[in-house]
Amino acid sequence: MVRHSGFNHSKIMVVDDEVGFAGGFNIGDDYARLWRDTHVRERGPAVWALGQSISIKWNAHHRAGEQMSWRPPDTWDPRITVAANQPPLLVYPIRLSYLDAIQRAQHRILINTPYFIPDQQVLEALLHAARRGVDVQVMVPEDSNHIVADWASRGFFGKMLEAGITILLYRASMIHAKTATVDGIWSTVGSANVDRLSLGFNYESNVVVVDRDFAARMEEIFALDAQRAVRIDTPRWEDRHGLARVVEALLVPLRPLL
């Protein structure tokens, strides 16, 4: 029953059914001034899908007389889709879109996420991609606002480094962006972290774009962020304090909850 509920973690705004916003931004002073985040603004067919994502969540928790009515889209653009989790139906398309893109990757995968606690299938997909020669880079905050999540994510770093994945720790501020690009053509921007809560429990909404120009811009942003990050190398990681290893091991049982 718990998996059928889900927290609403989406960050969407739709104005007059003409323009829509989606991404990682919360509303608050700290988020606006102190955090590094990514949101997208959409016009056109994708706005309808963002509105539907809002109405699905609204209708799931309101009675018939209070529900938003469904209306068909005027048109559609196959380059842009909205993947929206629906926990009551156990529908989690964001996770599937990530897996599909990672498994198709031939050249590079660039992921930015504030909390990296993947399930086994997502982790193995990334490891396998790196082992077959794909340039896999994962950027996370050096110190996020959730210390337990930080320590839990570090428990994956050893396997990732061994497989050849580049791990970047962003130092300039708390980076809260949830983005990915694959092979310079596929991109996603949204509210979903690469963790089990976002990919298999929460209400989340991600915009998925298959467009080279958009992906090029996302890669430029990733490169700029990388200039403010430090790369973890294997010798440095293997030389970490023994207490850190103990904490990482103790948090393994909590991974399904994070």
Task: Please give the residue ranges for each predicted region.
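Charged, low-complexity intrinsically disordered terminal segments
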Residues: 1-258
